[in-house]
Amino acid sequence: IFSILMDTDCILYLENGEVFSGFSFGFEGEVLGEIVFNTSMTGYQEILTDPSYHSQVVLMTYPQIGNYGINNEDNESGSCYAKGLIVRENCKYPSNFESKESLDSYLKKNKVVGISGIDTRKLARIIRGDGAQKCIITKENNLKKIKEKIKKFPVMKGNDLTFKATCKDIYNILGDKNEKKVFVYDFGCKHNILKILSEKFKLNLIVGPCDTPPEEVKKINPDGILLS
């Protein structure tokens, strides 16, 4: 571990024992989570705010991430759900007319730990072969301590994250007053799904928490029910 850290400042350690050295960016700290990968060339802002990535460490396989910054339009929810971000190269100076801040700044603000300088293609092949597994991004250089932290960290399987991703109260999204009314059970629903239903299909949406009682939905008397 000491030799691996010689020219870098943090490591990514996988549950299977694989070690990758890199450079920290975003929030300064340590993060444990389930590692998953995404092959999209763009859309990192949508991915970070997608409730389906709750408590996961996301690996982006595209070589450069952050080149168009962060804007006010592309969030898929009201929160940043990913716990960590792994990239080959973090673009420090984004260029886009809609950009409001850099990826680095956004991660700091939302307490998301990032690591760059990683061979992301190699890492993706490992995950593809071995499946999702626990990982840690850390500046710790004691391998024994790292292994203990990984071992103690709970597995994602069977962990109910729905209540952490759902909305707190019922709210309405108006489409066309002449169109049908749909009740949406929010199990971590993305904003874009609601946007398409209301703007493209003109549906009137009533979005409720995942534990909304059936009796409450019956009072609303919707034309349809969507589980999302």
List the predicted regions and their residue ranges.
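Short glycine/threonine-rich loop/turn motifs
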Residues: 226-228
